[in-house]
């Protein structure tokens, strides 16, 4: 039985088998979590879909892992700050409504 995509084709895209397994597992988790797919798939399983994306070159290992970590941290921090700002606005609105209610 020949598996598609073949391991030889995939190893042309990724430097090692270990890197391939890690990349495939991470991408499969992303797909299962609802991440948008980069192409139409022949496969049903997320693990095979991830391999199809790797084979097509749509998913690659980031060339600078420390830069990727920094960008992920920055995105998480921005999301946290946006959430805090939203909570602050809600608290201000509640306080204003309480104040307006006491004046009546």
UniProtKB/Swiss-Prot annotation:
GO terms for cellular component: DNA-directed RNA polymerase complex. The keyword Nucleotidyltransferase applies. SMART domains: RNA_pol_Rpb6 (SM01409). It is an enzyme of class 2 (transferase). Keywords: DNA-directed RNA polymerase, Nucleotidyltransferase, Transcription, Transferase. It comes from the Bacteria. SUPFAM superfamilies: RPB6/omega subunit-like (SSF63562). One of its GO terms (biological process) is DNA-templated transcription. The keyword Oxidoreductase does not apply. It catalyses: RNA(n) + a ribonucleoside 5'-triphosphate = RNA(n+1) + diphosphate. Promotes RNA polymerase assembly. Latches the N- and C-terminal regions of the beta' subunit thereby facilitating its interaction with the beta and alpha subunits. Belongs to the RNA polymerase subunit omega family. The RNAP catalytic core consists of 2 alpha, 1 beta, 1 beta' and 1 omega subunit. When a sigma factor is associated with the core the holoenzyme is formed, which can initiate transcription. PANTHER family: DNA-DIRECTED RNA POLYMERASE SUBUNIT OMEGA (PTHR34476:SF1). This is DNA-directed RNA polymerase subunit omega. It comes from Streptococcus agalactiae serotype Ia (strain ATCC 27591 / A909 / CDC SS700). The lineage of its organism: Bacteria, Bacillati, Bacillota, Bacilli, Lactobacillales.
